[in-house]
Design a protein with these regions (language model features):
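Conserved donor-binding/catalytic core segment of Leloir-type glycosyltransferases
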Residues: 4, 186-214, 222
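An aromatic- and histidine-rich active-site surface loop
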Residues: 69-80, 85-114, 118
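Membrane-proximal helix-turn-helix segments that form the acceptor-binding/catalytic region
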Residues: 77, 128-145, 237
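Nucleotide-sugar donor phosphate/pyrophosphate-binding loop at the beta->alpha transition
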Residues: 108, 118-137, 173, 177
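Nucleotide-activated donor-binding/catalytic signature segment of Leloir-type glycosyltransferases, i.e.
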Residues: 234-254
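Aromatic "clamp/platform" in nucleotide-sugar-dependent glycosyltransferases that forms part
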Residues: 271
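Short hydrophobic beta-strand element within catalytic cores of glycosyltransferases
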Residues: 288-291
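Conserved acidic donor-binding segment of nucleotide-sugar-dependent glycosyltransferases
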Residues: 306-314, 322-328
Length: 363
């Protein structure tokens, strides 16, 4: 099969969609398939081969509201004019508005739903309206629809009366790293609480910073993440944070692996999710995790961690204080969290599901 993924920031880069495409695409190449990945020009990514995948850089309008949708448009045009593929795989609800175009050339299309975009607080009324309408294109334009969580699958099936294929994101089996690079930041094993996500409002870093500020602890709070077009929000976080909070920006590679390997506690206070790869990775490294009690997080957690009431800083503060005082509660969840994600979210299992779906569409 020849499969095209439309569209993402680039490879290799951090980020949920980027990691998913890299893990799935590279494994499909190993199984004898050809993979094209359309990427943005804004992230200094080189065109050419990466892990056997053909990376193509297409133009995009570099503004918050038009960047992604223009990238998808130009990528789809390139696909129709320059390439011959069997499957066109569109990432996320917004890009689905162009998923009917490959069908005009007889190309099978898939739209993968990563979350309810219209719920994200960063969008104004125009953006929310666009994404609410895009739900319809995601449901009705492609040949097949997939969702990264059972919560999303049930939502779209009930709302639109369609069949949605549940295919989650995944993780690899890993070996934890001993402290090395993190020592340069004054960090060591069990000396910090970790937040590792994009710094956008719906990920909830502001709840965590506000709660952490009220605690009396010698542990640090490490904020590992960044986001495009979010300077005002990021600056507001830095202004709120106390001296025990470290902002490391976008972190990848060995440093990120060390941060996951040595954290005392991982916290995800997100208001909305599809299925958080960062959460799965934290559990995969054997971390105790504390997450907001939204349905998508509860699904991923499945009892192998702790929760607090969504958007409730006081409840988050209460749980942080409890887990800082009770290391036995922290230690109690570590191994079960790791075992849970390896049994249910391993990438090899996920790629089997994609390969089976793609093959069924060509019969």
């Amino acid at each position: 099969m020849r499969i095209a993924y439309i569209a993402l920031k680039g490879m290799p880069l951090g980020g949920g969609i980027e990691n998913l495409t890299e893990q799935v695409g590279s494994r499909l190449v190993e199984r004898g398939h050809e993979v094209i990945v359309y990427c943005s020009p804004q992230y200094n990514i080189r065109p050419g081969k990466y892990k056997g995948m053909d990376i193509k850089i297409l133009p995009a309008i570099n503004t918050k509201n038009l960047h992604k949708i223009s990238l998808v448009f130009f990528s789809t045009l390139h696909l129709l004019i320059k390439e011959k593929v069997d499957i066109a795989h569109f990432h996320a609800v917004g890009p689905s508005i162009f998923s009917f175009l490959p069908r005009l050339k007889g190309i099978k299309t898939v739209v993968q739903i990563h979350g309810l975009e219209w719920k994200r607080p960063k969008w104004g009324i125009i953006g929310k309206t666009f994404f609410m309408l895009s739900d319809y294109s995601a449901a009705y334009f492609p040949h097949k629809v997939t969702a990264v969580s059972r919560v999303l699958k049930e939502y779209y099936e009930q709302k639109f009366g369609i069949n949605v294929h549940y295919i989650p994101t995944g993780i690899n089996e890993i070996n934890s790293r001993v402290p090395n690079k993190i020592l340069e930041y004054g960090l060591n094993k069990d000396t910090y609480i970790l937040f590792a996500c994009r710094l956008v409002p719906d990920k909830g870093a502001h709840y965590l910073i506000n709660a952490f500020n009220e605690l009396k602890t010698d542990k640090k709070l490490v904020i590992a993440g960044d986001a495009a077009y979010a300077d005002n929000y990021i600056n507001s976080l830095k202004q709120k944070a106390n001296k025990n909070t470290l902002f490391l920006g976008l972190v990848t590679g060995e440093l990120l692996e060390e941060l996951f390997s040595n954290a005392y506690l991982y916290v995800l206070p997100s208001e909305i999710e599809g299925l958080s790869i960062s959460l799965l990775e934290a559990m995969n490294y054997g971390n105790c995790v504390l997450v907001s009690d939204i349905p998508e997080n509860l699904e991923a957690l499945n009892g192998h961690g702790y929760t607090f009431a969504n958007k409730d800083t006081k409840d988050l503060q209460r749980m942080l204080r409890l887990l800082l005082e009770r290391k036995d509660l922290v230690d109690d969840k570590k191994e079960s969290a790791k075992k849970h994600v390896l049994e249910n979210y391993h990438w090899d299992k996920i790629v089997d599901m994609y390969e089976e779906l793609y093959s069924s569409m060509l019969k």
